[in-house]
């Protein structure tokens, strides 16, 4: 067991990234355009370009006069992120990008193409302060929160990649298409960067020209169980999918595997999840990384099924995740027979349960592997 790291909820104070158009809601966009002395209709033009046409370079916004392009480029469209490394696997169907921000901070996103959907896994923080010992991100500590624009730029870049992608050596499923799903399951605890994440979600789900127009049902916000923030998220009425990273049904083990459990116990996290389900009518996803001889015992499967059925009834689904290897970890995934028995026992308690498809393990792009190295 690695030496436990402290929980960190408040990101270290660092200089803020430069203001970007994507940081601004409709009211702030109108104010920013007015500050530049431009007519009000330019705000909608810019939003249509960014959210509707996925254009972040004003020089490509040919419906704007050249002088206006120069003006907004300097004031509203600074270069925020640089892709410093891109790695692919699965014949191009899984692609990990290492991003570097203007202050040198690094973080990662992962684009995954499936036959029926295209999903981008995005980061909400550089690093993570939740200190889960089986997660490479958590063991790296928290550098800082990402800005709303830094979050949204990951989404826009993925949408552009899908729209423009083609070429030899690329599987047919990896060619072209439209971004359909967003999961806040990259680096960081989304609910610890609450205001910026919520602002990003609002822009993701709003129809163009105010946002990317992704269905709220296709957006998943993950959390290790910040119970008050889960309730707050429910009250936003955004109706996104909530994914609770549980990983153990009992406090004794979860106190170690998910250190935030020392603040909010399993019962408190499940009560908050039930509140979310009641308010939104949405089924809650439970994430459970299955670790050999740690949390895969039959009695824990029974307890998990019992507690989830009691707390959430039919409004729950368990995603069992075979543990992905991380550097220096002494743990590994449960054997397949143990995995199958675990799933069977959870289902026996009346709870929907499946094993999640693991993508990107070979390029350290799978759940728990993102470390922004290099």
Curated annotation (Swiss-Prot):
One annotated Gene Ontology cellular component of this protein: cytoplasm
Cofactor: [4Fe-4S] cluster
Binding site for S-adenosyl-L-methionine: 188-189, 222, 245-247, 324
Top class in the EC scheme: transferase
Entry-linked InterPro entries: Aldolase_TIM, Methyltransferase_A, RNA_MTrfase_RlmN, rRNA_lsu_MTrfase_RlmN/Cfr, rSAM
GO BP annotations, alphabetical order: rRNA base methylation; tRNA methylation
Entry annotated with the keyword Iron-sulfur: yes
Record carries keyword Disulfide bond: yes
Keywords linked to the UniProt accession: 4Fe-4S, Cytoplasm, Disulfide bond, Iron, Iron-sulfur, Metal-binding, Methyltransferase, rRNA processing, S-adenosyl-L-methionine, Transferase, tRNA processing
CDD domains hit by this protein: Radical_SAM (cd01335)
Domain Radical SAM core: 114-361
Cofactor note: Binds 1 [4Fe-4S] cluster. The cluster is coordinated with 3 cysteines and an exchangeable S-adenosyl-L-methionine.
SUPFAM superfamilies xref list: Radical SAM enzymes (SSF102114)
Alphabetized GO MF terms: 4 iron, 4 sulfur cluster binding; metal ion binding; rRNA (adenine(2503)-C2-)-methyltransferase activity; rRNA binding; tRNA (adenine(37)-C2)-methyltransferase activity; tRNA binding
Active-site residues (renumbered): 108, 367
Binding site for [4Fe-4S] cluster: 128, 132, 135
Subcellular localization, as worded in the UniProt entry: Cytoplasm
EC identifiers of the protein: 2.1.1.192
Catalytic activity: adenosine(2503) in 23S rRNA + 2 reduced [2Fe-2S]-[ferredoxin] + 2 S-adenosyl-L-methionine = 2-methyladenosine(2503) in 23S rRNA + 5'-deoxyadenosine + L-methionine + 2 oxidized [2Fe-2S]-[ferredoxin] + S-adenosyl-L-homocysteine; adenosine(37) in tRNA + 2 reduced [2Fe-2S]-[ferredoxin] + 2 S-adenosyl-L-methionine = 2-methyladenosine(37) in tRNA + 5'-deoxyadenosine + L-methionine + 2 oxidized [2Fe-2S]-[ferredoxin] + S-adenosyl-L-homocysteine
Disulfide bridge positions per record: 121-367
Additional remarks: Reaction proceeds by a ping-pong mechanism involving intermediate methylation of a conserved cysteine residue.
Record function comment: Specifically methylates position 2 of adenine 2503 in 23S rRNA and position 2 of adenine 37 in tRNAs.
UniProt similarity note: Belongs to the radical SAM superfamily. RlmN family.
Listed name of the protein: Probable dual-specificity RNA methyltransferase RlmN
Organism encoding this protein: Mycobacterium sp. (strain KMS)
